[in-house]
Every structure is written in C-alpha cells, then in structure tokens.
Amino acid sequence: MADVRTNIQSIDPVWEQIQDEARQAVLDEPLVGGFVHACILHHKSLEKALSYRVAAKLASNEMSMVVVREIVEEAYAAEPALVAASRADLVAIFERDPACHRLLQPILYFKGYQAIQAYRVGHYLWTQGHHDLAYFFQMRVSEIFGVDIHPAARIGRGIMIDHAHSIVIGETAVVGDNVSMLHSVTLGGTGKEEEDRHPKIGNGVL
C-alpha cells in the first residue's frame, strides 16, 4: 500500500496533499466528516472532486446536480487544460492568501475559487458553441457566489479572487496569468456598442 501511495503522490502530489488534509480534517472535526468525505475523500482525482463540488453548488430545480456534474466531467475529459488551470489557481491561493493554510480550503470553502472553476467550464462551453449552457453557468455563478463573469471573457491561470464579493468581468475582458483580485472589482464596458469594449489585465497584476 505504501508503494501505491508513493506512486500516486509522484503523479499528483497536489491531490495527495488535499486528501491528507481532508483525512486530518475529519479527525479534527468529526461533525464535518460527511461533508469532507462527499467533497474530497469519495473521489479518486481532483477533477472528480471539482466536478462534484461545482455541481453541488450550481445545481437547482432547473438543472439537476447529476446533469451539471456530467457537463463538468465531460468538459474536464475533453479539455485537460481546465484541470491544469484549477491546480494553478489552487496553488496561487495557497501561496498568496495568508488566510489559506491548506490546499483543501479553497475547494471546500472559498467562493472565489469555486466561482472561477465554474466560469472555466462555462468558458469551455462557450468556445464549443454551447452558448445557452454557458449562460446558465454564468447565471448560477452570479446567483450563488455574487460573481458575474461573462463566459466569453478570457481568464488565465493562477488566479486568486480574495473574498470574491461583487466581481464583474465583461464579455471582451482579458485577465492574464497569476492575477490577484480583491472584492468589488468591475471590468466593465467602455461604452462601445460592440467589439472590444472591456479592460485588459496583464500577467502578475494585483
């Protein structure tokens, strides 16, 4: 068993650390055991855990958790860069946010991280021509998290949105890699009626 765990860690050390943190969380706080098992320990990979978490947050009477989860899993399977970006976002938060002490925290508790992962799936759907599905994801992210990101907006990797309250990112906005945002940020339109009308944020900007 030790050899198997070593092999897993060499393949995905981020996921292995998340699982270790989840097991410790259950020992420390047994009352959250069911929640932590459902979100982390029942899953074999980060993408499976994220599929569950995003679906659990976005599901509604209009679209079931099963359907949302299938959409997310299909997106992850078709576009591995989505999961790579989710890892980069996770590490960015862990490294930059003094309130983040474990990789586990953003997946379970940080709405900024959760909102960005849902946006990434919505953006993938948009690029594949599934605009109404993408708009549904945008609507639910706005309703649940208070983060309104147009699915056509282009956002890089390693993103941290601290507190993630009242965030608006418009259709033609571009956000580079390794960007950190605080709350109440609006990348709104310039007044043009069409084409390129939103701000562009370069790499490494706070």
Set out the residue ranges of the language-model regions.
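Terminal amphipathic alpha-helical/low-complexity segments used for targeting or macromolecular assembly
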Residues: M1-R140
